[in-house]
């Protein structure tokens, strides 16, 4: 695969044509963003094998053709940009160090962030999310889930939240309780009839 070829090019230090467990553990950053100007570049469709990169901290794989993202168990991962792919499913279970997630312009139908308690920023606009629950995530400051298909959004008790954009969804209700620091709310183009902004 394209991802395997990339790994062999940069991390096969003993040139044996395979990535050993020891070599995989040396990987802390992966920059796999697709370069349209490179005529020989081939977009990545799968990140199979990334689960062995247990010490990965930063992952950028935007502008590819990835259909499924499984980063489960990568407990040192802090930054992910997987925007502009074809991702339908994303597994972030066990990503306990994750601070920033950019997953814009994909086809993600569900996103479970409950094990990502250190998240500070989430961008997941232009997906197919029908529900999103980040309630009680005490470090989350910024959330953009606009242009999805959300019928429910639970953002209550996110005590550090400053900015929420949930415009262009199908929300009929929105609970803003416990958002004492909220400074910006975009909830345009929904089915809201009332909005209680008392904090």
Each PLM stretch: what is its role?
Residues 23, 49-52, 62, 73, ...:
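C-terminal capping segment of individual leucine-rich repeats
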Residues 47-50, 69-71, 90, 111-113, ...:
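Canonical leucine-rich repeat
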Residues 42, 64, 85, 103-106, ...:
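Consensus "Asn ladder" position of solenoid repeat domains
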Residues 91, 101, 112, 130, ...:
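Intrinsic-disorder/low-complexity detector
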């Amino acid at each position: 695969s394209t991802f395997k070829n990339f790994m062999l090019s940069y991390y096969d230090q003993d040139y044996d044509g395979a990535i050993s467990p020891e070599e995989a553990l040396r990987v802390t950053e992966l920059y796999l963003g697709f370069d349209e100007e490179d005529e020989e570049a081939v977009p990545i469709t799968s990140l199979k094998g990334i689960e062995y990169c247990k010490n990965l901290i930063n992952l950028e794989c935007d502008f590819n053709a990835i259909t499924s993202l499984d980063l489960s168990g990568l407990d040192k991962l802090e930054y992910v940009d997987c925007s502009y792919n074809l991702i339908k499913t994303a597994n972030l279970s066990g990503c306990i160090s994750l601070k920033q997630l950019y997953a814009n312009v994909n086809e993600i139908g569900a996103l479970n962030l409950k094990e990502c308690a250190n998240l500070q920023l989430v961008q997941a606009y232009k997906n197919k999310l029908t529900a999103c629950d980040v309630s009680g995530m005490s470090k989350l400051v910024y959330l953009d889930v606009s242009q999805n298909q959300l019928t429910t959004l639970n953002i209550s008790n996110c005590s550090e939240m400053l900015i929420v954009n949930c415009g262009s969804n199908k929300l009929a209700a929105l609970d803003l309780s416990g958002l004492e620091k909220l400074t910006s709310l975009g909830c345009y183009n929904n089915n809201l009839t009332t909005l209680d902004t008392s904090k």
